[in-house]
Amino acid sequence: MKLTFSPASPFARKVRIAAIELGLVDKIEFTPAAVVPGQPNDDYSKITPLKKLPVLILDDGSVILDSYVIVEYLDELAGGGKLIPASGPTRWKVKSDHSLLQGMLDSMLLCRYEKLVRPQGLQWQAWTDYHWSRAWNGMARFEKHPDALSRPFDIAQIGLVCVLGYADFRFADCGWRKAYPKLDAFHEKMLARPSVKVSLPPTA
């Protein structure tokens, strides 16, 4: 299997953490790929029309898109029910938490692209503020309802690690650690896991 990835991508990081936790990392060839916002990225569009990272390319040439779907595939490959509960109320709680985190990451990337790609005179601050509020309020929800922080390690906790790591990486002055001490403690605890530490994004 091959995984297209960038060390800076929180979505690719999610898959990398999962692969390590599931004992499958040695079965995956991690292939660096560059997707530049606002550029055609024609070569990468041959792999996926969405031009998004990551993509898992199976040995038969078929592709699996979306970081969650890739983790779900790897989880099943490892026997199932490891990072995504197989059934019951916990399954739906974990999936719902992950969906929230996925949306938070989407909004954070949109904020990043607004500043990085759009010419300064055309940037829309109200739009950026709206999307940042989605990420910030999502953090507030996990701070207020911290049950997700103490479950056995799952896909939602991986997603939260990636959200907080991306906040440190791209929004270092946002103040999330001071605002959300429970999330700060959770993140520090997670850094003790080799999968989390080895997958940290590069220095911004």
Stretches found by the model and what they are:
Residues 56, 158, 190-193:
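Residue-level signal for nonpolar/aromatic packing positions in well-ordered secondary structure
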Residues 148, 199-204:
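Long amphipathic alpha-helical segments
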Residues 59, 161, 202:
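Conserved residues at the C-terminal ends of beta-strands
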Residues 101-188:
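GST-like fold's C-terminal all-alpha helical module
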Residues 71, 75, 95-98, 139, ...:
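Non-transmembrane alpha-helical segments in soluble domains
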Residues 1-125:
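GST-like domain detector, emphasizing the conserved glutathione-binding G-site
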Residues 185-199:
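Charged phosphate-binding loop/patch that engages nucleotide di/tri-phosphates or the phosphate backbone
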